Regions:
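Short, well-formed alpha-helical segments that are part of the catalytic scaffolds
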Residues: 14-29
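Acidic metal-phosphate-binding loop of nucleotide-sugar-dependent transferases
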Residues: 65, 93-94
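Donor nucleotide-sugar binding loop of glycosyltransferases
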Residues: 16-19, 42, 96
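Short beta-strand-to-loop acidic/aromatic patch adjacent to the donor-nucleotide binding site
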Residues: 83-92
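A conserved acidic beta->alpha catalytic loop
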Residues: 39-47
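Cell-envelope/extracellular polymer assembly enzymes that use nucleotide-activated donors
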Residues: 6-8
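Conserved donor-nucleotide/metal-binding helix-loop-beta segment in metal-dependent transferases, i.e.
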Residues: 98-107
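Conserved donor nucleotide-binding strand/loop of the catalytic core
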Residues: 33, 47-81
Length: 107
């Protein structure tokens, strides 16, 4: 929660099994209320890693919809969770989730 606003991090995932744990563990949970992972029919064990990490909101596509389709599913689920602030974080560790605190406080 940030200034009374519900913060949801969305993770559009594809083949993220090897990087998801590192990404997830750096999320600033003092500001983030929920995490959503949308798996775009990954051929690896991304979903199992997400479950093992305790991610509660996992959406699994039955077919690969591409990056745009994955983003849409992320935002749809965040809306369903009544998010006030949605931050998209790539679970392949392109950048550190430690930057989220700076991003959220700018909103």
């Amino acid at each position: 929660m940030y200034q009374g606003k519900k913060v949801v991090v969305v993770l559009p995932a594809y083949r993220a099994a090897l990087t998801l744990e590192q990404t997830y563990k750096e999320i600033p949970f003092d500001l983030v209320d929920d995490v959503v992972l949308v798996d775009d029919k990954s051929p690896d064990n991304t979903v199992q890693v997400a479950r093992d990490l305790g991610i509660r909101h996992i959406v699994m596509h039955k077919k690969n919809t591409g990056y745009g389709g994955n983003q849409k599913s992320c935002y749809d689920k965040a809306k369903e969770l009544n998010a006030d602030i949605v931050v998209m974080l790539h679970p392949d560790y392109q950048y550190t989730p430690k930057l989220l605190a700076s991003m959220i406080t700018l909103i």
